[in-house]
């Protein structure tokens, strides 16, 4: 039995909960990445954790392969979103509501869990700068020695109106906030260069792989697939928008 002890379950003060977009619209997965990760662990059963799991399909696809899959999501709107079937089946079993910027611990049969594989794409930038350190600290304590993390972080702004419509480039063709009298929601609260994220990740003890893809925005990326990226839903590095995200593969 898997349980979660969380200081706070719903990030009810987050713009992503108040103006839900990804929590209700996103249910991305990547069979290609799953196969690559499984191959890296010699196709043995692994424990995986997905942070900001939205509809939960990436987690469910690992479960369907016999793995221990856990997803954490900060908005309760996800329960009625595109991944409703997943949440109906796995809520409080494998999919949990959790504010990942507050202290939490996942347990299996009463013992603290550590994970072979931890994944988070298009999540870190949604976290307030003041909460990034706490988020990374929580991730690090849940990672096994010699475990693997895949982090994908958007580097571009994302502002929405009350209808969830894009208001600024690159997702909107022009800046629509000028003269707009309605309410605006800044979903990407932490828009920083890739090197800022690299330094922040390393400051919490994560070790970026020397192998893999290394360039201006990508650090040790070991795989030929991703789950998504920069809102374009690409499953293969190099798709349109690839350079609008930073990708990291790291271990303890």
For each predicted feature, which ranges?
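S-adenosyl-L-methionine-dependent methyltransferase catalytic module, highlighting the catalytic core
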Residues: 27, 86, 101, 127-144, ...
């Amino acid at each position: 039995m898997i349980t979660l002890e969380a200081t706070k379950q719903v990030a009810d003060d987050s713009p992503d909960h108040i103006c839900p977009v990804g929590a209700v619209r996103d249910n991305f997965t990547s069979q290609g990445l799953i196969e690559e990760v499984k191959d890296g662990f010699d196709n043995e059963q692994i424990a995986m954790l997905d942070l900001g799991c939205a509809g939960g399909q990436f987690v469910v696809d690992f479960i369907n392969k016999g793995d221990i899959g856990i997803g954490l999501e900060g908005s309760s709107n996800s329960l009625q979103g595109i991944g409703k079937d997943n949440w109906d089946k796995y809520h409080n079993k494998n999919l949990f509501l959790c504010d990942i910027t507050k202290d939490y611990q996942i347990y299996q049969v009463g013992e603290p869990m550590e994970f072979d594989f931890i994944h988070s794409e298009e999540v870190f930038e949604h976290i307030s700068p003041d909460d990034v350190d706490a988020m990374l600290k929580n991730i690090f304590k849940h990672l096994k020695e010699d475990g693997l993390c895949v982090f994908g972080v958007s580097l571009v702004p994302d502002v929405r109106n009350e209808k969830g419509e894009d208001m600024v480039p690159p997702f909107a063709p022009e800046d629509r906030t000028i003269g707009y009298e309605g309410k605006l929601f800044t979903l990407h609260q932490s828009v920083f260069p890739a090197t800022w994220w690299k330094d922040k990740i390393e400051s919490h003890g994560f070790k970026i792989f020397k192998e893999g893809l290394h360039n201006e925005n990508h650090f040790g990326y070991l795989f030929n697939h991703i789950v998504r990226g920069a809102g374009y839903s690409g499953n293969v590095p190099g798709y349109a928008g690839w350079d609008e995200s930073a990708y990291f593969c790291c271990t303890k």
